[in-house]
């Protein structure tokens, strides 16, 4: 009997772990988990629960949140903290203390990743003028993360210091900590005028990328769109990540209907639209989502 063996390409399928910002679906974490699982995700990124930011949940609330996820068999990919999403003139200790609360949540919910930002500046203040203060704060945060054994994921949020590829690189190279890595967000790059995020930023940042946040945007209006429907070169980015051997998280953050104090919101229906758009892209390039 002759056995036909599969090719190497057929046997070495790339798999990424699908996650998503649960509070974009509903304030109730039980609903968040149910919808994510219905879309094929086994993980959740936690930004808030019951309308309360993750760093403001008390011990009882964290225990209740952990119980919800444990009951449903849902793992936590990252804590989507608000650390660093404040004016740089606030005392450094302010954000170090909030990071401590995010670390507490990460430990309780069983993840090593914590999303953070690199500070806003006042109106009329040049970005170059806040660099030293930003770096001092990012070093302090990275030091705290190293001590706790967690990894900080810097998101390229619009209008913070690190909102362009060049300044994201500046942060990780200047701080130089293994506890500070990068999350890639194509839409945010588009919204600050990076015309071609993949062409302009991928090679620069790939050595430091550890996490993928999934959304897209149109350059003419800044409108957020499902992945592949904007100008963020999402397909090119996904293809390169596949070819580079990326095997980490892909976290849906659609922002399709609203932006509020806790972040973006989509609702179950729009979140599903975003999830299916992303899956069409990964199917196209032969990446499995688990």
Residue ranges and their predicted role:
Residues 6-19, 76-86, 118-121:
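N-terminal small/glycine-rich loop or linker at the start of catalytic domains
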Residues 2-19, 25-42, 66, 70, ...:
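Histidine-acidic metal/acid-base catalytic patches
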Residues 24-26, 48-50, 82-85, 118-122, ...:
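Active-site-proximal loop/turn and secondary-structure-junction residues that shape catalytic pockets
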Residues 45-46, 76-81, 112-118, 150-155, ...:
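Short beta-strand segments at enzyme active-site cores
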Residues 18-22, 152-155:
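Short catalytic-loop micro-motif centered on adjacent basic/acidic residues
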Residues 55-59, 88-93, 125-130, 193-196, ...:
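Short, solvent-exposed loop/turn segments at secondary-structure boundaries
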Residues 46-66, 119-125:
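Glycine-rich, proline-tolerant flexible connector loops at the mouths of alpha/beta enzymes
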Residues 28-34, 68-72, 87-182, 191, ...:
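Active-site acidic/histidine proton-transfer and metal-coordination neighborhood
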């Amino acid at each position: 009997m002759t056995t036909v063996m599969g090719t190497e390409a057929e046997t070495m399928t790339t798999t990424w772990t699908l996650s998503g910002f649960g509070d974009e679906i509903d304030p109730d974490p039980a609903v968040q988990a149910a919808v994510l699982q219905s879309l094929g995700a086994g993980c959740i990124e936690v930004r808030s629960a019951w309308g309360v930011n993750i760093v403001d949940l008390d011990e009882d609330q964290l225990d209740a949140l952990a119980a919800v996820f444990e009951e449903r068999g849902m793992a936590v990919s990252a804590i989507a903290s608000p650390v660093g999403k404040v004016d740089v003139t606030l005392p450094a200790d302010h954000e170090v203390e909030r990071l401590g609360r995010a670390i507490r949540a990460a430990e309780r919910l069983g993840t090593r990743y914590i999303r953070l930002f690199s500070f806003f500046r006042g109106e009329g203040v040049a970005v170059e003028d806040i660099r030293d203060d930003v770096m001092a704060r990012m070093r302090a945060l990275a030091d705290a993360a190293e001590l706790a054994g967690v990894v900080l994921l810097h998101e390229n949020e619009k209008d913070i210091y690190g909102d362009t590829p060049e300044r994201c690189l500046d942060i990780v190279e200047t701080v130089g900590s293994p506890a500070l890595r990068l999350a890639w967000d194509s839409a945010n790059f588009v919204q600050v005028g990076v015309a071609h995020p993949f062409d302009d930023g991928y090679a620069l940042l790939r050595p430091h990328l550890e996490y993928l946040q999934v959304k897209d945007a149109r350059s003419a209006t800044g409108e957020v769109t499902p992945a592949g429907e904007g100008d963020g070169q999402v397909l090119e980015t996904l293809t390169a990540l596949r070819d580079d051997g990326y095997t980490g998280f892909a976290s849906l953050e659609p922002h399709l209907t609203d932006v509020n104090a806790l972040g973006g919101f989509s609702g179950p229906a729009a979140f599903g639209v975003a999830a299916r758009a992303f899956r069409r892209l990964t199917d196209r390039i032969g990446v499995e989502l688990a």
